[in-house]
């Protein structure tokens, strides 16, 4: 974080106020609400195309200090086994003149760094730039879980396969399968057929096992009457050459996040950022016109066995050059709309298997019934992608303060 702060400070050397700021003079004002903070610029800002960041902002702990002295919260060393965890989420107001990349902050002591979505030249009047910070509950899955759908097709004869099945102490059958997949002209339809476990061991979800430096070849898992169909991804070659493929997985009754198809297509588990799941475009090759817009669909869906409302915010992947992905909501059991924008003055081709975005999965408390239509709708906060949540159901700073024993 310190290195990023220094980099952004240098980048902001060409981003100044319309009057020269004195040394140590604050750039930001803040208003503290029970469950969120709104910060805004207290001086005019002149942004130039060289800028990649806004001026650094005090940490959440420093902002909250006047209301909650010595406020501290740190989740950077949380247990990796937890399925949900709390973190601060900062994003720009939808009416801002410039767009800001949403960011996840795990520690109240971290200096806040806000990166711009794109290089722009703009004059920002006092109070014209607003950023909202709140505490969200994020959903995190250890490894990749797949939803085991039904396979209604008639199984064909498959090559010899070595199948090993072990029943763990947690009553979850674990499989290790080795063999050469059945191939077809459609490289997305290569698969294994393995013996179905006993009905008492059949579970609705599968948890894949792989090293973080390995590419997991399993694409999806389907349950038939007498078999499991394990679809696998062909090698990333113009003419794939298949060798022995070994995969391991276990069947489980619950999953914090389970996908119909493995989201790590031609990727390793190591590409999984701390908070995000990659969104990889898997459709046909398309051409975006200069400065054009197009909506395509991410051909995947997910579900969760958590007893709460889960949704996802899909945002742009920072490595995209000329194609920008606008924020959108990815709802459970539905494909994700990918709103693409060509930011260049020339046609751009989007190839299959392009890492186009990242999905942040959150628990989104929403107002129900008539409350959504009454005066209480003023308590609604709109997150990036149009996700609307009830701010009264968010974790309050007061509760976080008491939980740390500071009150």
UniProtKB/Swiss-Prot annotation:
InterPro entries documented for this protein: Herpes_Orf11
The protein's superkingdom reads Viruses
Name of the protein in question:
Protein ORF11
Its source organism is Human herpesvirus 8 type P (isolate GK18)
């Amino acid at each position: 974080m310190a290195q990023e702060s220094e980099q952004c400070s240098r980048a902001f050397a060409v981003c100044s106020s319309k009057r020269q700021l004195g040394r140590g003079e604050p750039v930001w004002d803040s208003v503290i609400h029970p469950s969120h903070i709104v910060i805004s610029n207290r001086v005019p800002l002149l942004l130039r195309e060289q800028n990649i960041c806004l001026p650094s902002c005090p940490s959440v702990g420093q902002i909250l200090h006047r209301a909650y002295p010595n406020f501290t919260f740190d989740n950077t060393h949380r247990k990796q086994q937890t399925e949900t965890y709390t973190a601060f989420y900062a994003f720009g107001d939808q009416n801002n003149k410039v767009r800001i990349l949403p960011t996840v902050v795990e520690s109240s002591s971290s200096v806040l760094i806000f990166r711009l979505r794109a290089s722009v030249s703009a004059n920002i009047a006092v109070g014209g730039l607003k950023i909202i910070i709140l505490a969200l509950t994020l959903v995190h899955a250890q490894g990749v879980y797949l939803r085991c759908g039904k396979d209604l097709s008639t199984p064909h004869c498959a090559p010899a396969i070595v199948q090993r099945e072990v029943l763990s102490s947690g009553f979850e059958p674990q499989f290790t399968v080795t063999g050469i997949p059945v191939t077809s002209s459609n490289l997305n339809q290569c698969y294994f057929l393995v013996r179905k476990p006993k009905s008492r061991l059949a579970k609705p979800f599968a948890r894949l096992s792989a090293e973080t430096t390995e590419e997991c070849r399993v694409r999806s898992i389907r349950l038939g009457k007498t078999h499991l169909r394990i679809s696998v991804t062909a090698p990333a070659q113009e003419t794939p050459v298949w060798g022995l493929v070994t995969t391991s997985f276990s069947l489980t009754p619950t999953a914090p996040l389970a996908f119909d198809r493995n989201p790590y297509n031609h990727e390793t588990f190591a590409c999984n950022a701390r908070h995000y799941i990659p969104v990889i475009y898997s459709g046909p090759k398309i051409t975006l016109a200069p400065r054009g817009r197009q909506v395509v669909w991410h051909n995947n869906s997910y579900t969760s066995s958590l007893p709460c409302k889960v949704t996802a915010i899909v945002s742009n992947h920072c490595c995209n050059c000329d194609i920008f992905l606008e924020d959108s909501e990815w709802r459970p059991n539905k494909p994700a709309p990918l709103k693409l924008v060509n930011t260049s003055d020339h046609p751009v081709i989007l190839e299959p298997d392009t890492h186009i975005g990242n999905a942040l999965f959150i628990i989104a408390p929403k107002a129900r019934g008539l409350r959504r239509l009454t005066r209480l709708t003023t308590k609604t906060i709109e997150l990036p992608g149009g996700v609307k949540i009830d701010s009264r159901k968010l974790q309050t700073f007061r509760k976080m303060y008491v939980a740390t024993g500071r009150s």
